[in-house]
């Protein structure tokens, strides 16, 4: 597992108050991890801060799974 992947999963677990084991790559923030719209906004802000990147609103709306978040961060770091 890459460092980015581990970091993203840790942030998601912390922000959503779930066990790290529940944060699988294909987990949906809303359907699987119980996030609401405020949780997802706070999650995007936490990812932006941790990885010093900007996630535009139109991109943030597409980030609905753990893997989508990992992919976006990896792309932003290229």
Curated annotation (Swiss-Prot):
Record PTM text: 4'-phosphopantetheine is transferred from CoA to a specific serine of apo-ACP by AcpS. This modification is essential for activity because fatty acids are bound in thioester linkage to the sulfhydryl of the prosthetic group.
InterPro entries: ACP, ACP-like_sf, PP-bd_ACP, Ppantetheine_attach_site
O-(pantetheine 4'-phosphoryl)serine: residues bearing it: 37
Coiled coil: none
Pfam families: PP-binding
Any one annotated GO CC term: cytosol
Domain Carrier as annotated: residue spans: 2-77
Pathway terms, separated by semicolons: Lipid metabolism; fatty acid biosynthesis
The keyword Magnesium appears for this protein: no
Entry keyword Lipid metabolism: yes
Subcellular location: Cytoplasm
Highest taxon of the lineage: Bacteria
GO biological process, one term: lipid A biosynthetic process
MF-aspect GO terms: acyl binding; acyl carrier activity
Keywords: Cytoplasm, Fatty acid biosynthesis, Fatty acid metabolism, Lipid biosynthesis, Lipid metabolism, Phosphopantetheine, Phosphoprotein
Main location: cytoplasm
Annotated family: Belongs to the acyl carrier protein (ACP) family.
Function of the protein: Carrier of the growing fatty acid chain in fatty acid biosynthesis.
Name assigned to this protein: Acyl carrier protein
Organism: Wigglesworthia glossinidia brevipalpis
Protein encoded by which gene: acpP
């Amino acid at each position: 597992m890459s460092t980015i992947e581990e970091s993203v999963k840790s942030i998601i677990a912390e922000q959503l108050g779930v066990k790290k084991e529940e944060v699988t790559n294909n987990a949906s923030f809303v359907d699987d991890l119980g996030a609401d719209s405020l949780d997802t906004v706070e999650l995007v802000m936490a990812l932006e801060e941790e990885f010093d990147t900007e996630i535009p609103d139109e991109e943030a709306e597409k980030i609905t799974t753990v893997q989508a978040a990992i992919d976006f961060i990896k792309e932003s770091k290229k």
